[in-house]
């Protein structure tokens, strides 16, 4: 009899679920802002609890501002997962181990923000034993060195930020003002507004790096996610409107901001590549097309091209389910 394993990745903005039974899998991607809806998490998960034998869990939502501490977040998330499923729950930690839910609560810092490590361990076991894993999601970009199947990354988000292994820039949710405070416009180096007018999703859509369907987060102004709405938001970063700035000028402006995004990713990956003498890169996440532009000088292996877009958009949930499946098969 085949075992049904549910891999769950609970992020601050998105929850991703992978159902794995033997070689068959199905992936669910749900926009679920925990800072607004954390009390509805149990009900959400109950929609996926049919015939589940094991749950493999990773999380980053414990960092959401609905929780005062990581301890509170980890405990609350695990409690809600346990209530939603009538089966064993295993939580993947930053050391590459599966913990019982009780062990995970006691060692809450070890399971905090552990989703990147599940992806890295999966890549090391199933794809490439020496490489840099670059996972660009909606909000952040993980840059993980792997050598001889060993994940060499720092363990906490703070240490990863300090060592070029975590960049707080993503395909969708990053405010444009994070990318630059000045951009050349009409021949002059021009100051930009730091108001929450536009996000990387607007640039990504304008430049055809994502589809409207991929734009899953809320828009800064509550308006649409179409090309015209994205241009309308972007022009506000110049404290202007569509009557003052032509569309071709705005597209050029978007390209200049996009190049700043590419530079930010490239300089961090370059640092890791030199530090660990690595030149193969495995890319995954919503931002794969952006990563291809940023890292065109590297040997690239795409999870999207290897496993499909669904897996690329939900790699940690797929990875943690595959890793538990492998462990149970031993």
Swiss-Prot record:
Pfam families: Hydantoinase_A
E.C. numbers: 2.5.1.131
Domain of life the protein comes from: Archaea
InterPro entries the UniProt entry points to: ATPase_NBD, Hydantoinase_A, MfnF, MfnF_synthase
Disulphide-bridged cysteine pairs: none
Pathway: Cofactor biosynthesis; methanofuran biosynthesis
Catalytic activity from the UniProt record: gamma-L-glutamyltyramine + [5-(aminomethyl)furan-3-yl]methyl diphosphate = (4-{4-[2-(gamma-L-glutamylamino)ethyl]phenoxymethyl}furan-2-yl)methanamine + diphosphate
Molecular function terms, GO-annotated: hydrolase activity; transferase activity
Alphabetical keyword list: Transferase
UniProt keyword Transferase, yes or no: yes
The family this protein is said to belong to: Belongs to the MfnF family.
NCBIfam families hit by this protein: MfnF, one_C_unchar_1
Function per UniProt: Catalyzes the condensation between 5-(aminomethyl)-3-furanmethanol diphosphate (F1-PP) and gamma-glutamyltyramine to produce APMF-Glu.
Protein name, as recorded: (4-{4-[2-(gamma-L-glutamylamino)ethyl]phenoxymethyl}furan-2-yl)methanamine synthase
Naturally occurring in which organism (per UniProt): Methanocaldococcus jannaschii (strain ATCC 43067 / DSM 2661 / JAL-1 / JCM 10045 / NBRC 100440) (Methanococcus jannaschii)
